[in-house]
Amino acid sequence: MRSHQAGRKLPLLQLLGCVAVFSVFVFTIQSSFFADNNRKLDLQPEDIQILSDFQSSVQQCVANRGLGLSAHIIDHCNLILKFPEGTNSTWYNAQFKVFEALEFKYNVCEAVLLWEQYRNMTTVLTREYLDVRPDGWLDYAAMRIAQLGADKCYNRTLCEEHLNVILPAKPPFHPRQFHKCAVVGNSGDLLKTEFGEEIDSHDAVFRDNEAPVNEKYAKYVGVKRDFRLVVRGAARNMIKILNGSDNEVLIIKSVTHRDFNEMIKRIPNPVYLFQGIVLRRGAKGTGMKSIELALSMCDIVDIYGFTVDPGYTEWTRYFSTPRKGHNPLQGRAYYQLLECLGVIRIHSPMRSERKEDWSSVPSREMISRAHTAALRLQRSQQPTSSKRDGSGQFGNCKVWGDADPTKGPVSGSPDMSETRKKSNYKKWEVMPFRSLRKEARDHYIQMKGVSQYKMDGNKLDDLVCVRHPLKLDT
């Protein structure tokens, strides 16, 4: 009898257990639902309205300046840029075996936050960055040295020997250092319009890779040479590329190499390594990195030689035969988005009649309001556990550190040639604070002497922030 009763109790206990598990499951779903609802309730109507108005302004800008592109708004943050029907997409992606798409989706809120952030960034690799970044010398430094012979800098002295010749102690360049800058691409359409004098009128000119500067192309691309961003392959020809200018700053996009160092020790030009995040969307290539570099130093960035006609079949260059490039339609769409976000100004033969007419681009005031609203929106949607203390200009600082109070070593090595030792290659590193443009000095004070760097390989808003003493007389 007792055995029979025990047998009846067992299914009953199992049933009660199932009910309990189901109740917990339902409670979890409800909690998640209400948590999501509460997160949505964090969205402020005024912020949504500001961002919606900004989207409408961007849409109108694309309609006026997009040369056939159109913007289709999804919500207050997302839109799609579409090429017109009938656009001949001839760019074939052999890896995925598809032709390039004719429409691209972008999150404008994220784009505004990212590109406004570059206006406060340091985009040159420095010793202070490696000192402050967690495992900066052990891990990251090794990633920037080709053929090191190890995956990490177990021997820091050896790694320093590789980097010293191009590693300044602190940022050699500063936000707001120049007012108006030109970034000159390599597109063949540069030969359609004589932009040379206009390009040379800028405070600083940025060029890419091996693009020549000579009398043959002077009326098209100018002759002014201030900065040049090069990929690893072009860096192998740096002596030839830099010939004719002792002051042009060479910035290597990827890694250094012992062969590069031997060449650097023989030339009078400043040479540094680029430091910046790898974009997962948007246009790819050196041109985009040149824009990042320019934006970290300049108020206004004008770009030339980046325009591509929808449907073209070859990646043309103004100084050589066509060659294979990458994602022209995606690049064209993304550059247009950047112009309508106030990041760049596009110059091309197709726009010669619209010269200096930027009235359809959202104003700095509207962009600033959209940036503030996007920042509040971003932080309201972050899980409580991931939110950091602080807000404002330092709210995205993930890692903090202090710069060495001493001035620190300038880039270089004892075995440099007499040509380099007697040159002015370190002029940017030793430039007195009082010699900076007033806007750059004011920005430095506003930032309380803090340098901000991107944390490569992490989230877009994770920064390494380094404090400097506010010694304004140095």
Swiss-Prot record:
EC number(s) from the headed UniProt entry: 2.4.-.-
Top enzyme class: transferase
Transmembrane segments: 15-35
Glycosylation sites: N88, N120, N155, N243
Pfam family, one: Glyco_transf_29
Top-rank lineage group of the source organism: Eukaryota
Gene null: resulting phenotype: Inhibition of pollen germination and retarded pollen tube growth.
Gene Ontology cellular component list: endosome; Golgi apparatus; Golgi membrane; Golgi trans cisterna; trans-Golgi network
Lumenal face of the membrane: 36-474
Cell compartments where the protein resides: Golgi apparatus membrane
Keywords, ordered alphabetically: Glycoprotein, Glycosyltransferase, Golgi apparatus, Membrane, Signal-anchor, Transferase, Transmembrane, Transmembrane helix
Protein's GO biological process: pollen germination; pollen tube growth; protein glycosylation
Mode of membrane association: Single-pass type II membrane protein
Tissue: Highly expressed in inflorescences and siliques and at lower levels in roots, leaves and stems.
Region (Disordered): 376-421
Family: Belongs to the glycosyltransferase 29 family.
PANTHER family recorded: SIALYLTRANSFERASE-LIKE PROTEIN 1
Function: Required for normal pollen grain germination and pollen tube growth. May not be required for pollen development and female gametophytic function.
Protein name: Sialyltransferase-like protein 1
